[in-house]
Amino acid sequence: MLANDVVGLMARRGGGLGRIRIAVLVLSITAMLAACGERVQPPLSFALVPLPALPKEVIRLSVAHVVNPRLEKFSDAQLAVLLDAMRTASKVHLGREIEFDRVETFSIDEYFKVIPASRQAWRNSMIYDFKKGKGDRVKLEDAYGLAIDQQTVPARDWAAFAAREIGLEKVDTDRTAWKIRFADVHLQRLALLANLKAADGKPVIDQTPHNEWMFWNSLGEREHTHDVIITNQLVASAEYGAVDIHSALRGGLTSGTTAFAPQARFGTQLWWSTFAFTSNDPVIVEMRGGEKYEPAEAAWLAGIGAAHELGHLLFQYGHPFGVPACVMSPTPMLRFREQSRKLDAGACVAAQSPSMKPGVLRIIRPVYAADLKR
């Protein structure tokens, strides 16, 4: 089976930001890594994560706070506000009551060190290495071509959404033109993000893999995991797959993702970054449309945004481009305040978007040889 049919569906990049599809063959990945002499543990196949059977009672979810000590993080009080906002948004926009277990805190290195390096290696071949300037532009464009093909809304809807964010006056749906545009804006804006500085004066995006979306995609490989992971890490990168169009508009910045997690209660987990809510770097503020947040508002908006990922996790909803009333509608750039004011549960239902049907989002998990021996 082709990886562009399956691997890329391992996750939904949200914020309400989404990311799906990896445009490479599984055998090609294995051969590439073998040629490099790397020890890898590539998947034998891929399996569809079923739509979860939700309990009738209140849904309880475990929570981890994964912290990069170099970056500003939410306080305990802000985390409480964030989780309260998620509870509220879930009840209003998803129709389910949720509660959270006590938050457990980990350093980013501590949380990821238990993931086998061999299971990270096959993902590394899919990373566009913008740090060393060794990316393959054609492969990136092809990844966007695949993302365009697999949208679940009419082309005019996603094209209009994207055109507004790049200043394109005339909206067209030409696939070739758009895959080039998406690659252009992705790399141009990622270059701006690469220049962000942390409080210590050093680049936020350093030589660690902490910023790489593929690094975060490996979370589901943990033997013991959490349903909800909150982090202060900036995740901004480029890949040869798992791309989605609204992430391109932000230069590959991803606020959150819902992905496979066999050990999690419902077979998936979500992670959500608070970086875009705490940073006041001019690049981030511009992406927020000039929005600046006090700590309490930042936490509340972060929770409303994270509820988007709950929709992926609980119902496997897609992205209803063109219906901003839906909590599942991708947030334009990072304008979370603007987006929150447009939410209207009744109007979302009335719109009857095909992306709001349970199970429309296909999430795939890798299957390894070791899994078959259990």
Regions found by a protein language model. Give the residues of each.
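Active-site scaffold of zinc-dependent metalloenzymes
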Residues: 241-298
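Sec-dependent signal peptide recognition
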Residues: 19-26
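Propeptide-to-catalytic entry region of secreted or membrane-anchored zinc metalloproteases
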Residues: 40-249
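Phospho-regulatory, Ser/Thr- and acidic-rich intrinsically disordered linkers and terminal tails
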Residues: 45-56, 68, 182, 272-273, ...
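C-terminal motif of bacterial Sec signal peptides marking the signal peptidase cleavage site
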Residues: 34-35
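The catalytic-center signature of Zn2+-dependent metalloproteases
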Residues: 277-374
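N-terminal secretory signal peptides that target proteins for export/translocation
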Residues: 1-19
